[in-house]
């Protein structure tokens, strides 16, 4: 299976997902997305103390099969409580959030924690930031010919660590993305849809236990009859029926409404 490493944003293989792929020209044309990756040799590995690396900048080598080693830099967003080996990472120049077992995956080499800190910024409009969480949106992307293409999706949450970024997913491509949506809103590239007729979630009493699928193993039947397995790793607070799933054969984080009825 093709991996996201070494691919440009939006060119990730979706053959095993059962969904149409996102073409590269649908991604935001920002300078960070125009970086070119070159093959490099592994850097000197650091010692193995298992420090908490959430919030840290990292770099590591990646080698798929007999291919060359490529170097990757990114920010560690989270360590998954139900699978502490699994980290969520935002790589520089890429829009997807990736899930990797950094200390176990044999394709990862020379993992280093970098000295540079993640810059923190003040949210320019806290009320707007809170308002868009859990909302359906229309997000405009610039295509190669300069025209606009509209993607409907849902804003899921403020991203951890990178505090001016938001988690979002799309109907056309239900994986976890990150964008600075306040900027897009102010530029006219993001529109919050009117509230639907869906009833709001019921208020819960303090201390009330709510059933959750987090930590459960899941099985997904593909169109060709084969199956893929994975784990539910997160429940979206703003939409409790929506969950993040990490499949065993993929690095992307999938976003599904697991309680939706037809």
Swiss-Prot record:
GO terms for biological process: female meiotic nuclear division; positive regulation of DNA-templated transcription; positive regulation of Wnt signaling pathway; protein localization to chromatin; rRNA transcription; transposable element silencing by piRNA-mediated DNA methylation; Wnt signaling pathway. Residues 1-49 are annotated as: Disordered. PANTHER family: SPINDLIN. Belongs to the SPIN/STSY family. Residues 93-98, 142, 250-252 are annotated as: Histone H3K4me3 and H3R8me2a binding. It comes from the Eukaryota. Residues 53-116 are annotated as: Tudor-like domain 1. The modification N6-acetyllysine is found at residue 44. Residues 132-193 are annotated as: Tudor-like domain 2. It is found in: Nucleus; Cytoplasm, Cytoskeleton, Spindle; Nucleus, Nucleolus. Chromatin reader that specifically recognizes and binds histone H3 both trimethylated at 'Lys-4' and 'Lys-9' (H3K4me3K9me3) and is involved in piRNA-mediated retrotransposon silencing during spermatogenesis. The lineage of its organism: Eukaryota, Metazoa, Chordata, Craniata, Vertebrata. Oocyte, egg, and very early embryo; not in the 8-, and 16-cell stage of the embryo. Isoform 1: Present in testis. Isoform 1 is more highly expressed in adult testes compared with newborn testes (at protein level). GO terms for cellular component: chromatin; cytosol; nuclear membrane; nucleolus; nucleoplasm; nucleus; spindle. The record marks 173, 180, 184 as: Histone H3K4me3 and H3R8me2a binding. There is a cross-link at residues 7, 28, 44 (Glycyl lysine isopeptide (Lys-Gly) (interchain with G-Cter in SUMO2)). Its main location: nucleus. Disruption phenotype: Early postnatal lethality. Ovarian folliculogenesis and oocyte growth appear normal but fully grown oocytes show defects in resuming meiosis. Residues 213-262 are annotated as: Tudor-like domain 3. This is Spindlin-1. The modification Phosphoserine is found at residues 109, 124, 199. The keyword rRNA-binding does not apply. The keyword Transport does not apply. Homodimer; may form higher-order oligomers. Interacts with TCF7L2/TCF4; the interaction is direct. Interacts with HABP4 and SERBP1. Interacts with SPINDOC; SPINDOC stabilizes SPIN1 and enhances its association with bivalent H3K4me3K9me3 mark. Interacts with SPOCD1; promoting recruitment of PIWIL4 and SPOCD1 to transposons. The 3 tudor-like domains (also named Spin/Ssty repeats) specifically recognize and bind methylated histones. H3K4me3 and H3R8me2a are recognized by tudor-like domains 2 and 1, respectively. One of its GO terms (molecular function) is methylated histone binding. Residues 27-38 have a biased composition (Basic residues).
